[in-house]
Structure formats: C-alpha cells, structure tokens
Amino acid sequence: MAEEPQRSPAPTSPFAFTVPSNSLSELPDIPPDRPVLIAGPTASGKSALAARLVEDGGGAVVNADALQVYDCWRLLSARPSAAEEAALPHRLYGHVGARQTYSAGHWLKEVAGVLAEGLRPVIVGGTGLYFSALTGGLAEIPHTPPEVRAAADARLAEAGLARMVAELDAETAARIDLQNPARVQRAWEVLRATGRGLARWQAETAPPLLPLSDATALVIRPDPAWLAQRIDSRFDLMMADGALDEVRAALPDWDPTLPSARAIGAPELVAHLRGEIPLDEAVAAAKLASRQYAKRQRTWFRNRMRLWHEIRLP
C-alpha cells in the first residue's frame, strides 16, 4: 500500500453519527491493508463509521453514493463537510457537475483509478447498484442516445410506470425492481436503443473489479423507527444549515429529468421556491420521501447482501 500523509483528527459534522461501542464490538477483525465496503440506508451513520475506520487504520474514504458525486449537493446529499474531506483522504465526492451524465459505469472506472493509488479503500454509500457492479461486474451496455432518453421521459410522464413495465421484455421484467421508476426507465431505454433486453446485456457481464471475497463487506441494518427519527432530525439540521439556499442556487438550471435532480428533498424545496407549496409542506414531503427511500434501500440490502457482515443499530 502507498505511504499515507499525516492526518489531523476528523472534525465533527452537523450530521455526524457517534458510532455506538456495541456496534464497533460487532466488527470483524479487519487487516489494515484489506479493502472495506460499508453499505447502509440514508442517515444510518455509515459515513461516520467509514471515517472512523480510516482514522484508526488508514486508507481513504471512497464514495459509493450516486448523489454525493454532484458538486451542487453537499447539504441535501449529506456529503462530508469540507473540513472532514480535508482531515482524511476522500475520493469521488462532489466532483461531477449537475448537468453531467454519470452512471455506475463512470463510477466503476473512477474506482479503478482509486484502487490503483495504493491506499486501502473504505468504500461507503447507499447506492446498491454501485456495490453490485464493483463486486459482481458490470455489463458494457451502449450509451442511451438523447432522443431515446427524451422518448422515455415522455413515455413515463404520459403513460405511467405500469405501461412502461408492460413494454419491457419478460426476462428483464423478472429481474429488476418494477416499483423503481429509474430502473424501469433505464431498462425501457436499453431495449429501445439496442433491441436487446437489459437482462441479455447483463448476462455478458465482465469480471468484477473487487470480488466480495477480497474485501470485508459490512451492511448497517438499523431499527426502522430509530432510523425514521434520525432522518427527520437530520433534515431539520440540513434546513438550519442552509439547504434551502443550496436548492435556490440550483434553481436557475433546474431540470427534473437529470439524475442530479433525484436528490431527496430537492424537488420538494424547488416546488416551495416556485411558490407551489408552503415551506412546512415541502419539508414534510421531503422527510417522507427520505423515509420511503430508506425503506427501499433496506429491502435492496436485505435481498442482495445476505453474505455481508451485519451491523445492527442502535
């Protein structure tokens, strides 16, 4: 492994999670040079756990969250603060413009570069697809042409999710989350653009960049009621720290069809800034959206990460 720079202790974030001592005792023995993967739902404290492991054992905190890559969202995505990023090595945070195309394939290529640096990676996030691509490989699916993406946006808006599901090939429909509009639209686009279903492309997956057997994989499984309270409290902190101003800064170039617009709370606060709903309704809707997102994450992790070491909270 590469020689690491001297570090000062990591500062405390307004969203910081104090890792319970009983949770640290549940950790398996982790050799200092072994890659670590940490998955967990939003607001579960996974970023603080990653920082703790890097502070204690060295390495770099590597982002595996699809929204924390965007430069426009530090507060709404709960990205580490500037002070936290300066105190410990961090990679792949806030480096993508809001209007840029960024996919799991882009992330995987950048992670390959991070692994080549030689620092022990502690890869942390809530985007299950990133971890799946990292440890299981990712199919080389051709880029979706803009006209197909536009047609998919229009189809979803006009016909609805159920109709798009009905237009998928049976093999793909049996494998993806049919309640997730982004996943359904992506599968629809692939079928229209290539004439082959997403499942067929995925059957030609390349070898994984980091096989699960070569890493210590941790998944946080919080109590749902405990997590819901943390989600609500954290959003209040985000608002107090200037989340509304962050969204206001993004408003002139706001495009709801962009992946960056999927930041939890952004559509709701945009609606308020446009005079469509009162602030209290926007905040309540954002909190609800966060809790619903966390539920989807927990389901995904439960179904796909059965071989990962569980950390139960609180």
Curated annotation (Swiss-Prot):
Sorted UniProt keywords: ATP-binding, Magnesium, Nucleotide-binding, Transferase, tRNA processing
Amino-acid positions noted as binding ATP in the UniProt annotation, renumbered to this chain: G40, P41, T42, A43, S44, G45, K46, S47
Renumbered residue ranges of the record's region Disordered: 1-25
Residues reported to bind substrate: T42, A43, S44, G45, K46, S47
Residues the UniProt record annotates as site (Interaction with substrate tRNA): T127, R149
Listed cofactors: Mg(2+)
GO terms for biological process, alphabetical: tRNA modification
Annotated catalysed reactions: adenosine(37) in tRNA + dimethylallyl diphosphate = N(6)-dimethylallyladenosine(37) in tRNA + diphosphate
Annotated EC: 2.5.1.75
Top-level class of the enzyme under EC nomenclature: transferase
GO function terms (MF aspect): ATP binding; tRNA dimethylallyltransferase activity
Protein family per UniProt: Belongs to the IPP transferase family.
HAMAP family per record: IPP_trans
Function, as annotated: Catalyzes the transfer of a dimethylallyl group onto the adenine at position 37 in tRNAs that read codons beginning with uridine, leading to the formation of N6-(dimethylallyl)adenosine (i(6)A).
Subunit composition and interactions: Monomer.
Protein name: tRNA dimethylallyltransferase
Organism whose genome encodes this protein: Cereibacter sphaeroides (strain ATCC 17023 / DSM 158 / JCM 6121 / CCUG 31486 / LMG 2827 / NBRC 12203 / NCIMB 8253 / ATH 2.4.1.)
The organism's taxonomic lineage, starting at the top: Bacteria, Pseudomonadati, Pseudomonadota, Alphaproteobacteria, Rhodobacterales
Gene for this chain: miaA
